[in-house]
Regions:
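Structural signal for interior beta-strand "rungs" in well-ordered beta-sheet cores
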Residues: 5-6, 10-127, 131-132, 137-139
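Strongly charged
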Residues: 143-146
Length: 170
């Protein structure tokens, strides 16, 4: 469902996809080829939420903000199942693993992998090309060229997959 909130109407690109039971509220902008999967919630009732071109927000994820903390997701980002993003910035071509939590004013660089169940605390900055695991999250190494390629391939998979869903079930 897509809801306006206090006269703020979500902007959904004509070539983006929102699952029927996902919830998009208020100050949310979805760019071309982005996809919002089942039971995900993007609650733009306080600050802006921006989802970049080709990015996917997978099932059960929650995106929200606090006053003064917008949420920005770059291009070709994969946000895995059950992720919590709160007032943070995610760089292009990054992958946020299943169940990860990223808090206010955290900044994730480009081409990063944030491991499943990782916790990125407030104000933490993760450099480009980092692999992060743990709670609290720690950079354990740089990602390989093969891993960067895999992140891109995963985003492309979801760009193709939402089109199949839009043709098959709606």
């Amino acid at each position: 469902m897509i809801y306006d909130f206090e006269k703020n109407i979500p902007e959904v690109h004509s070539e983006a996809w929102v699952a029927a039971n996902a919830t998009i509220i208020g100050k949310v902008k979805l760019e071309k080829n982005s996809s919002i999967w089942f039971n995900a919630t993007l609650r733009g009732d306080i600050e802006n939420i921006y989802v970049g071109e080709g990015s996917n927000i997978q099932d059960g994820s929650v995106l929200h903000t606090d006053p003064g903390y917008t949420l920005k997701i770059g291009k070709n980002v994969t946000v895995g199942h059950l992720v919590m993003l709160h007032g943070c910035t995610i760089g292009d071509n990054s992958l946020i693993g299943i169940g990860a939590v990223i808090l206010n004013n955290a900044k994730i660089g480009k081409n990063c992998i944030i491991g499943a169940k990782a916790l990125i605390t407030e104000n933490k900055e993760i450099p480009d090309n980092s692999l992060v695991i743990g709670a609290p999250g720690k950079v354990i190494r740089q990602v390989t060229e093969e891993e960067v390629k895999s992140i891109t391939e995963n985003a492309i998979h979801y760009q193709n997959n939402w089109k199949k869903y839009s043709e098959s079930i709606f």
